[in-house]
Swiss-Prot record:
Disulfide bonds join 53-67, 55-63. Residues 1-25 form the signal peptide. This is Endothelin-1. Residues 26-50, 83-203 form a propeptide. The gene is EDN1.
Length: 203
């Protein structure tokens, strides 16, 4: 009989707490429903960034770094050094859909995604001559690949072909380095997303 008062006290506390828990459950259920409707910010947030501009030629390394990877360039006496890699995630949407008329115009070095981006427009407008030289280089590259018979043209033609061969090899090296940079940026983006997902699951 010593346990009887204790059992009654426990039953009283249990029945007293039941309405409170029911009320708390009713108060929490709308919050749970509202949380279920709206996704959490961690799940929906992704570090995506659209291209700043679209280059006329992917062989223009400085333009590709500026438009696609948003890298700052430092002019040194020996060469141009890129640094400050921005967000690796980028949109693959072509700017031809946004500017169909301007995309066909290859006189500019690049086409900006936003007309309000004055820095981008000045960069693309200032690079008109570089873009023209790049187009000329591409045409020469195609002609070099097709081959030219220098047997009748003499030593100047042979010398020109040797110089063009060196330039072509250099441009191929630049193109390969750009492809490697894009591949590394893509791998970094995938690694970042995987780390973000695992971090959200653990917490």
């Amino acid at each position: 009989m010593d346990y009887f008062p204790m059992i009654i006290a426990l039953l009283f506390v249990a029945f007293q707490g039941a309405p409170e828990t029911a009320v708390l459950g009713a108060e929490l259920s709308p919050e749970a429903e509202s949380q279920g409707e709206t996704p959490s910010p961690h799940a929906s947030w992704r570090p995506r960034r659209s291209k700043r501009c679209s280059c006329s030629s992917l062989m223009d390394k400085e333009c590709v770094y500026f438009c696609h990877l948003d890298i700052i360039w430092v002019n040194t006496p020996e060469h141009i050094v890129p640094y400050g890699l921005g967000s690796p995630s980028r949109s693959r949407r072509s700017l031809k859909d946004l500017f169909p008329a301007k995309a066909a115009d290859r006189r500019d070095r690049c086409q900006c995604a936003s007309q309000k981006d004055k820095k981008c427009w000045s960069f693309c407008q200032a690079g008109k001559e570089i873009g023209r030289d790049q187009d000329t280089m591409e045409k020469r590259w195609d002609n070099q690949k097709k081959g030219t018979d220098c047997s009748k043209l003499g030593e100047k033609c042979i010398h020109r072909q040797l110089v063009m061969g060196r330039k072509i090899r250099r441009l191929e090296a630049i193109s390969n380095s750009i492809k490697t940079s894009f591949h590394i940026a893509k791998l970094k983006a995938e690694l970042y997303r995987d780390k973000k997902v695992t971090h959200n699951r653990t917490h």
